[in-house]
Amino acid sequence: MSSPLLEVKDLQVTVGEEQKVLLDGLNLTIYPGETHVLMGHNGAGKSTLMSALMGDPRYTVTRGQIIFKGQDVTHEPADVRAKLGMFLSFQTPEEIPGITLENFLRTAQNAITGKPVKVFAFRKELAQQMEALGMDESYADRYLNVGFSGGEKKKSEILQLLMLKPSLALLDETDSGLDVDAVKTVAQGVRAYHNKDNALIIITHNAKILEGLQVDYVHVLDDARIVRTGDGSLENALFCVYGNAISNSLYPVEFDNGYIRVGGYVGSESIAG
């Protein structure tokens, strides 16, 4: 068996001077080729986990370790993790005036590989990937995400994923706010990226983005930790019984004697197989 791509060990994450605990005792192991889905009610810690993995300075790791590609990156800044091959797609991508989408991608690619970018080959691949995502080539010359629609911003994120080819992609509600056609396009981009050598962690409210992907593990977060892990059939069961309720509910998810409980709703866990 190959070595783990990511190991999260007994992770505790706090925020603010009062050190409010957002994650506590969280463990997670991911191997190359795997797809993991995070589910849980609002405030369960899904986005916090993604941000902490990427090294967001707003959060402090007060216990535990984050091991990426065999290297302890627990206290490394985001740029070090990015150069090692970690990528985070934001719920709301930032606008960056003054740097075009093409220049951003070329600079990022150079920083990650440490090698000069071959301009002709780069532009050819960029044009091909933009066409596949239904993005007009003129967006390459526009400032990054400035004036982009919500859908174009999300496509820009997937374009970055395809061009930079990270080892681990953290997709935080990349499909949120998109219409049906845009979700399909984003899903196609995610499928085009994924292979046996990289891995995905996905937060989503929409099962459509998972179509065509083999979901290896589904993790339900509650009370600052992962409280349940299952295979792809658990994800199917949760979506079938509750739809978006599992992700949108303000209530905790509970597992008790073979039943899944979300707020006042109860469903049999046995439908997960």
Q: What positions do the PLM features span?
A:
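A short, flexible loop at the N-terminus of ABC-type nucleotide-binding domains that lies
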Residues: 2-8, 12-25, 31, 37, ...
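The feature captures the beta-strand-to-loop junction immediately N-terminal to the Walker
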Residues: 39-41
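ABC ATPase NBD Q-loop/coupling interface
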Residues: 65-81, 145
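Q-loop/switch helix immediately C-terminal to the Walker
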Residues: 92, 98-113, 125
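ABC ATPase C-loop
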Residues: 161-162
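Walker B catalytic motif
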Residues: 173-174
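Helical segment within the ABC ATPase nucleotide-binding domain
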Residues: 183-196
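Conserved beta-strand-loop-alpha-helix hinge in the C-terminal portion
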Residues: 217, 225-247
